[in-house]
Amino acid sequence: MEVADIKKNIEKILDNNKAQSITSINLKNKSYIADYMIVASGTSSRHLQSLSEILVSELKKLGMDDCRIEGKDSADWKLVDAHDVIIHLFHPEKREFYDLEKMWSEEIPKPVSYTHL
């Protein structure tokens, strides 16, 4: 399955399970950790936990058996590592505080070339 298809499936799973403010960020040429980052909000700690567990379960059905959840002990953040797509699930206040969308959406500065006189 292509990475873009995996991303679309994840977005659909999140939407079907009432995740809020689902945002996808293209990380190609910005990071080697993944091709895409998806950020979404949940309404409660339990909702975040459910979203992360549902994602892993649904991705297993698509043949992605080794996805994992980080932040199991956190009440306001979960991360699902789906290899080329990473998913951050936040309580709205924590999402606003960390503002990953702004950080990862900005252009990467290009190195300046100096010529010697």
PLM region spans:
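Helix N-cap motif at beta-to-alpha junctions
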Residues: 42-45, 83-85, 93
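Short, intrinsically disordered, mixed-charge
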Residues: 12-16, 53-64, 105
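Short, charge-patterned binding micro-sites
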Residues: 26-41, 73-78
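Long, contiguous binding/interaction regions
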Residues: 2-20, 46, 91-108
